[in-house]
Amino acid sequence: FITYISAIGGQAFGVWLLGLSVNNFSLVAGINACFFLVSASILFLGKSKLSLSLSSADGEILKNEKLSIKEQFLTIYRNLRLVFLKGGQKNFGFMIFAVLLINALGGALGSIYNIFFLSHSLLDFSYTEALFISQFCALLAIIISSLTGNDYFGKQSLPRLMMWVTVGLSLVGLANLFNQVVLGLLFICSTLYVSAKVQPKISALLLKNLAPEVLARTSNFLGLLFTLSIPVGTACFSLVAVWNIQLTWMLFVGLSLLAIFLTVINLKNDI
């Protein structure tokens, strides 16, 4: 929760600074880099206080684990496959690919809107105001979702949640393709509200079906895949958006439909 509040404050500061500097993106990027540098310096100076002591049992496990990188990846793959099989998902590959595709599409929305609002207005707001409103609404939807874990969507299975998210992403793309900016923003908020339920579902599956000694490694590897999919999606869509924003939304809709197809396959095996 504190992370989301900090994000809202950071977005407000960034938008204010962007307006103050008359859209000087280089200045904002430089200040952003300085903040990251300060954060890294604080972590480096306090790293001795962040060390985690291991129990003797964990120490023995680490000493006895002398697997190669390939063997470790195979072990993690088998663990993940077993988790999703126990969760009722037979098409493990399709499931992971669908989640990564959803993550890439969702992560790319911010960069697309940064370019989209240069040529499209949101209710006659300025560029910086439109950016702030869209980002604030997105974060607010995620915060509300995190505070309502037992609602209708929180009780749905992972494939059903993914189906709702993929349909929402396709509606976002279609709305913006036809220049319905306000409608697209409403679809974004709805989609992010549902998508915020996906990660807890996956974490619950891992906690329920993995032994403690392999939980951290498997969870971190899955988190790494999700994290890497975001810059890939951002880079690809940003390159297309600079060239043609309409083509970007068409590509976004096409990949969303592919994600829907993959989730339909997983939904059929939701046993």
Where are these regions (language model features)?
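Substrate-agnostic recognition of the 12-TM MFS/MFS-like secondary transporter fold
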Residues: 1-18, 99-110, 146, 187-239
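Transmembrane alpha-helix termini and helix-breaking/packing motifs in multi-pass membrane transporters
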Residues: 8-31, 119-120, 232-249
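Helix-to-loop junctions at the C-terminal end of transmembrane segments
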Residues: 18, 144-157, 241-242
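A single, central transmembrane helix in multi-pass transporters
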Residues: 22-27, 75-144
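Alpha-helical transmembrane segments of multi-pass secondary-active solute transporters
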Residues: 27-32, 130-131, 161, 218, ...
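Helix-loop junctions on the cytosolic side of multi-pass membrane transporters
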Residues: 29-62, 265-271
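Juxtamembrane intracellular "pre-TM" segments in multi-pass secondary transporters
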Residues: 49-95
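C-terminal transmembrane helical hairpin of 12-TM major facilitator-type secondary transporters
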Residues: 158-199
